[in-house]
């Protein structure tokens, strides 16, 4: 544990899943803006970039090559990538995809490499196809420096994986103060499981897809009373980074403003003090009183939707209406979300989205709520 943690000069990683884009097309990454963010991030002593095969409609890895790999010495940064296990149908696919990722990123090795979004079913399939052994061979060959996995399942399943696969050096977990005691996400239980196995943790979704960066009302006031200059996001990221077994916290930064804010308090990181911890407990109590949809905007649900509903955008509009009321502005937000895509009422209840959701949301039922709010109707069943 100590060795991996000591590799990180600072505890903030740059997640490349919500990069600046041109217009509304997530596949059209704004290279100029991304390069400027990369430069500012690296010049402050940060060095960890996290990408993955599906991010930005499979364009994130190529953007990493253009804006980082082609512009900086390889030893100046750590690069993490992930095996999209859902795309693996036969053993040879591990090699094919890995080679494709090296080509996309323009590298000969990855500093950190993860099996992506593992759960019980995917672990069993990876074992059946020999995926753990295949990637261990890549590590032995020097093409992977450190091998781990990102995880979306129960603490019991995590216990099973770590017991059966001691060759895995780290785990990437969803940890934020809202989900800390959640029975569905099980952030605390999963973290404590990793601690028992002496496996260091990389944190994803510390701001819960932006939810904890946009507090209003009483939750916002509680934090402002502590420090009226600190952003809500700063408390969320510092909460995760304050955990002893956390080696790194990822933030999917979309613009320079977010990057400058995050780096300002993570440059010389200070763990939360007791007063701040108590305040966060009160914030969570208040948040649980607001019935928003806890979507993290990972977009795993979008690709397979037969009605082309952009579910995260639809949920965003709904959450905004819960917080600010149904008015011209919130209705416009919903109209923009469905302008070139399916409406909430177009849902045919096939359930494909729910099988892909790491948050285990009842998406079909939630789409009914959205339709009632914005369309004065309910989805056809």
PLM region spans:
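Local cysteine-cluster metal-coordination motifs and their immediate loop/turn environment
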Residues: 292-308, 343-360
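Active-site groove signature of glycoside hydrolases
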Residues: 103-122
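Active-site mouth loops of central-metabolism enzymes
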Residues: 18-32, 82-92, 121-124, 220-230
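Short Fe-S-cluster ligation motifs
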Residues: 323-350, 376-381
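Acidic (Asp/Glu)-rich catalytic clusters
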Residues: 4-8, 43, 65-76, 99-108, ...
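Beta/alpha (TIM)-barrel catalytic core signal, keyed to glycine-rich beta->alpha loops juxtaposed to Asp/Glu
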Residues: 118-296, 300-309, 313-316, 326-332, ...
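N-terminal binding-site loop/beta-alpha segment at the start of enzyme catalytic domains
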Residues: 1-77, 134, 140
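Short, acidic/polar
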Residues: 27-41, 89-105, 153-162, 232-239
């Amino acid at each position: 544990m100590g060795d991996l943690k000591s590799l990180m000069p600072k505890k903030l990683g740059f997640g490349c899943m919500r990069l600046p884009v041109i217009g509304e097309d997530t596949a059209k990454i704004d290279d100029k803006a991304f390069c400027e963010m990369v430069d500012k991030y690296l010049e402050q002593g940060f060095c960890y970039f996290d990408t993955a095969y599906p991010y930005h409609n499979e364009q994130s890895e190529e953007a990493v090559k253009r804006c980082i790999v082609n512009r900086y010495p390889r030893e100046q940064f750590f690069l993490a990538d992930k095996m999209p296990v859902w795309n693996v149908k036969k053993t040879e696919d591990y090699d094919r995809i890995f080679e494709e990722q090296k080509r996309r990123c323009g590298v000969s090795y990855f500093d950190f490499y993860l099996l992506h979004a593992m759960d019980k079913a995917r672990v069993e399939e990876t074992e059946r196809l020999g995926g753990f052994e295949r990637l261990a061979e890549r590590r032995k060959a020097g093409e992977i420096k450190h091998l781990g996995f990102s995880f979306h399942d129960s603490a019991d399943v995590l216990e099973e994986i770590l017991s059966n696969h001691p060759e895995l050096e780290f785990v990437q977990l969803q940890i934020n103060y809202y989900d800390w005691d959640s029975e569905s996400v099980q952030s605390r239980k999963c973290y404590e499981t990793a601690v028992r196995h002496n496996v260091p943790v990389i944190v994803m979704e510390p701001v819960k897809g932006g939810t904890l960066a946009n507090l209003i009302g009483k939750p916002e006031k509680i934090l402002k009373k502590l420090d009226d200059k600190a952003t809500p996001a700063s408390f969320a990221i510092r909460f995760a980074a304050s955990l002893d077994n956390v080696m790194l916290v990822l933030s999917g930064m979309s613009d320079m403003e977010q990057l400058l804010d995050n780096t300002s308090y993570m440059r010389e990181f200070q763990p939360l003090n007791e007063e701040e911890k108590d305040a966060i407990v009160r914030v969570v109590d208040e948040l649980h009183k607001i019935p928003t949809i806890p979507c993290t905007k990972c977009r795993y649900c979008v690709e397979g939707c037969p009605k082309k509903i952009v579910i995260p955008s639809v949920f965003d509009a709904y959450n905004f209406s819960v917080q600010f009321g149904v008015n011209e502005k919130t209705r416009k937000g919903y109209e923009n979300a469905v302008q070139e895509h399916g409406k909430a009422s177009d849902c045919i209840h096939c359930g494909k989205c729910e099988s892909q959701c790491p948050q285990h949301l009842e998406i079909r039922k939630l789409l009914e709520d959205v339709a009632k709010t914005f369309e004065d109707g309910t989805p056809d069943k």
